[in-house]
Amino acid sequence: MLVTIQNAHPVGGTITAPPSKSMAHRAVLCAALAEGRSPITNLEFSKDISATLGAAAQLCARVRTGADDAVVEGLGHFVPLAAPVDCCESGSTLRFLIPIASLTGQAVTFTGRGRLMERPQSVYEALYREQGLRFEQSAAGLTVEGALTPGSYRLAGNVSSQFISGLLFALPLLAGDSTLHLIPPVESRSYIDMTRAVQAAFGVESRWQDENTLAIPGGQTYHPCDYAVEGDYSQAAFPAVLGAACGGVTITGLAPDTLQGDAAILDILRRCGARFTRTAEGISFEKAPLHGVDIDLADCPDLGPVLMVLGLLCEGTTVIRNAERLRLKESDRIAAMEAELRAVGGLVESEGGTITVQGCADRLHAPAGVLHGHNDHRVVMSLAVLSLATGIPLTVDDAEAITKSWPNFFEAIKPLGAEVEHVG
């Protein structure tokens, strides 16, 4: 799908952050593992969350959905699978479910789309092979079989925290106690603690034994509960960058006391010189001169694409470090954003996981043709921010990629001054 994005009027207005995708994944799975009825409110039925709901319904739950909520009724047991579990393009769905699949007593095959089956699963593969369990991965799908055993697990702390969270979901249900030893440095710690916090709401506990070791008692049971999903700082980063550059933007629906690692966007913007205030009504941005800073992406990799746009809008140089994982997302996000930003005159370079962006807002120009969304929701949304912040109309392909995380994105930005035309 092609869309053209441009300013209908000067940037300004109010936008409500969509529900947190990260928290919703976790709440749905905890509810599915709990015997009984768990209402989950404030849901956005993106493709990723729909994949997790669908998987829960296949494995161990009844799921009923409303306009912006769902009731997940855990059956208290796993059901025989009649078909593979389709994870669509959701890395969280796949990586969270692989250890859970070991509890089912059957072979479980996962399928996916896009680059999902190309994304590395070596952490799980090594663990499964070490325990003599089946782990077979190909472009067509991934099959696991066999029960994980309680005990001591060692994982690199600088790989995706999704592997750690996946084990956190399953290990409490084993008969014995387990420990997770994370080899430092431990990145995305906030996502690990988010998993633990959602589990705690459903009655399952773990604790940090020391800075890098999690103690997980076995023999636990998930209990149903009513769960309300917070607003999403990952998605709020897009209007936040726009507001920092242009002013006049207010974002509502974000909890001030949150475990979301991507809440770091506010500190990053503050360091860049952004001017904003937080009240009970939301976070309101005023226009202010922005300057480049040094950004560590280790704990907030999803912010990478929009921070590259931010770098163009700042005076001076922005350096983004520890961004290696961006190359293994729905696209190689570093290469994708480099290509598209250069097409409008952006000065961007990368080496490994370090990205250097030169502020050059006054040199940016209309591209020679269509920009590419690379089938990546965060690339598409970042390019929309670029268009609105600079006043340069942009036509972007693969725009349907937004349905992966924020299906209503184009409608949501219209009150901020966006005109979005579907052109093919």
What are these model-predicted stretches?
Residues 1-424:
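Short, structured segments at the rim of ligand-binding sites
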